[in-house]
Amino acid sequence: MLVEALPYIRKFEGKTFVIKYGGAAMKDEVLKNIFAENVTLLRKVGIKVVIVHGGGDAITKTSAKLGLETTFVHGKRVTDRQTVDVIQMTLAGKVNQDIVQLINKDGGNAVGVSGLDADTILAKPSPNASTLGLVGEVAEINTRYIDLLCDAGLIPVIAPIGYDMEGNIYNINADDAAAAIAVALKAEKLIYVSDVEGVRVGNRILKTICKADAAELIEKGIITGGMIPKVVSAYQTLDGGVGKVHLIDGQITHSLLLEVFTNEGVGTQFVNELEQEPTAEEGAS
């Protein structure tokens, strides 16, 4: 793999990758350690890595321990002020620091960041605020703190919490926060580490899909259900200036490195237009 990886290492040195970290890779102890090792390696070869993490299961468990009921509407957590306190305590606390500790154990120099720090994530109420409460959307991303950390060789690990100018704190969807941060940083890649293998058509996973083909597959009913918003979001992110968007299964051992440093990859990469087939020296990822 090392020989295959060398062109990619040269290609991506100094570039920024935003990684949205979620799914089973956040729960399984072996996968958690492998993710930390992979992230550390990316940083060691000169890639600027920014992590945005989820943590919904941990929030639900903490709420239950505190005797608080958890309610979801269309998959989104109804968030009152008590729930915001739990989210701050859990997401920006234990979940965030556990990730930081694992990366630092491998020499990765990670730093825990909340979206509240240095006005990193400014938020606004969701259009469904009357139903969802303090669930917010990203209004603005301030990159100065992230840039400072990355330029110092550190790995920002960001809990997706934001606040508005009135001081209201909001729970923000981690996928949305990661996309907004990637656009603000003009990242080379946005990589979603989840429990989804990629875009499946029949019995195969599409390695690369362009905007026109994705629109056609949606229109024909081949891409359906929960994959549609993922695909739409990917192309909105590309339109915002991000180089490529990747969707990979974090349950595959070393999926992050395999996606970035091999010709075949393991998931689906989203591009605006299909490129001419690269040479071995140029690489595909």
Swiss-Prot record:
Sites annotated Transition state stabilizer: K20, K230
GO cellular component: cytoplasm
Location(s), subcellular: Cytoplasm
Pathway assigned to this chain's UniProt record: Amino-acid biosynthesis; L-arginine biosynthesis; N(2)-acetyl-L-ornithine from L-glutamate: step 2/4
GO biological process: arginine biosynthetic process via ornithine; L-arginine biosynthetic process
Protein EC: 2.7.2.8
Sequence positions that bind substrate: G55, G56, R77, N171
Main location: cytoplasm
Keywords of the record: Amino-acid biosynthesis, Arginine biosynthesis, ATP-binding, Cytoplasm, Kinase, Nucleotide-binding, Transferase
Reaction it catalyzes: N-acetyl-L-glutamate + ATP = N-acetyl-L-glutamyl 5-phosphate + ADP
Sequence similarity: Belongs to the acetylglutamate kinase family. ArgB subfamily.
Protein name as catalogued: Acetylglutamate kinase
Species of origin: Chlorobaculum tepidum (strain ATCC 49652 / DSM 12025 / NBRC 103806 / TLS)
